Swiss-Prot record:
UniProt record, GO biological process: apoptotic process; gluconeogenesis; glycolytic process; reactive oxygen species metabolic process
Binding site for D-glyceraldehyde 3-phosphate: 149-151, 180, 209-210, 232
Oligomer and partners: Homotetramer.
Designated name of the protein: Glyceraldehyde-3-phosphate dehydrogenase 2
Length: 332
């Protein structure tokens, strides 16, 4: 049984907790969020506008939120170094704040007594692991790891399958991405990204993403071969990757479908999905796959030039992989 603590109770933190509570060998021991009181934590865990109401019992007292009779200790500490992870015997701290995402800042959890840390955001200094792609490279001496981003988790399994079978010479990715909490309900200040300050619910907003370049970190053979961008669109959840690639080997679209389907039914089952149905984004709400290949949406221009389409629930699929990575780290 791996004892975990969650730091940051936002969209990902709450879903990670929902998923972790379903796993027999994961025990959620503690939760820290300096901005949320216990009654509000319980409320936000129970009611979710996107994923629906939590099916079990949720309550709280002065020092806990209580889910289906299971008491989870709560803290409102701004500095993770001050958390009682040692006395609570925390094996893995899951940091879903988006703040402590580098080795030096995530180290605060180790200083507080956690044995290891899983960061639920891409990191420029912590090693990144994508389940189904490079998790076998994890070694037990690594104390702090990153689960990369939701978009990297969608793109990397597909890119790996395509590269292994046909070779990728170079490629461009676009993610058509649902709104997230960093965006604005009405036009407001966003000094680093002026477009990002525009009304989320009324615009298609071009944005940057490091997701494609990050694939090169988890798949070194693709280093420097992929880059990408994002369009933020007014949907609350579920996003889609368009991967347009120049291949090394000539092939047919039918052959690509066959290869992806075999991977989805084989070694990448549970990470990579496959559909030939006439689907739209809401069909993937609550889908636990990292990436679902849309066979009917892709197109081919020539034997070496294709556009491939893959869906992902950027909240639920990603949060499922966070818990998978926690279990993998605990076993190593």
């Amino acid at each position: 049984m791996v004892r975990v603590a969650i730091n940051g109770f936002g969209r990902i933190g709450r879903l990670v907790m929902r998923i972790a509570l379903q796993r027999k060998n994961v025990e959620v021991v503690a939760l820290n969020d300096p901005f949320i009181s216990n009654d509000y934590s319980a409320y936000m865990f129970k009611y979710d506008s996107t994923h629906g109401r939590y099916a079990g019992e949720v309550s709280h007292d002065d020092k806990h939120i209580i889910v289906d009779g299971h008491k989870i200790a709560t803290f409102q500490e701004r500095d993770p170094a001050n958390l009682p992870w040692a006395s609570l015997n925390i094996d893995i701290a899951i940091d879903s704040t988006g703040v402590f995402k580098e080795l030096d800042t995530a180290q605060k959890h180790i200083d507080a007594g956690a044995k290891k840390v899983v960061i639920t955001a891409p990191s420029s200094t912590a090693p990144m692991f994508v389940m189904g792609v490079n998790e076998e490279k994890y070694t037990s001496d690594l104390k702090i790891v990153s689960n990369a981003s939701c978009t990297t988790n969608c793109l990397a399994p597909l890119a790996k399958v395509i590269n292994d079978a046909f070779g990728i010479e170079e490629g461009l990715m676009t993610t058509v991405h649902s709104m997230t909490a960093t965006q604005k309900t009405v036009d407001g200040p966003s000094h680093k990204d002026w477009r990002g300050g525009r009304t989320a619910s009324g615009n298609i907003i071009p944005s940057s993403t490091g997701a494609a370049k990050a694939v090169g970190k988890v798949l070194p053979e693709l280093q420097g071969k992929l880059t990408g961008m994002a369009f933020r669109v007014p949907t609350v959840d579920v996003s889609v990757v368009d991967l347009t690639v120049k291949l090394n080997k000539e092939t047919t679209y039918d052959e690509i479908k066959k290869v992806v389907k075999a991977a989805a039914e084989g070694k990448l089952k549970g990470v990579l999905g496959y559909t030939e149905d006439a689907v739209v984004s809401s069909d993937f709400l609550g889908d636990s796959n990292s990436s679902i290949f849309d066979a009917a949406a892709g197109i081919q221009l020539s034997p070496k030039f294709v556009k491939l389409v893959s869906w992902y629930d950027n909240e639920y699929g990603y949060s499922t992989r966070v818990v998978d990575l926690v279990e993998h780290v605990a076993k190593a």
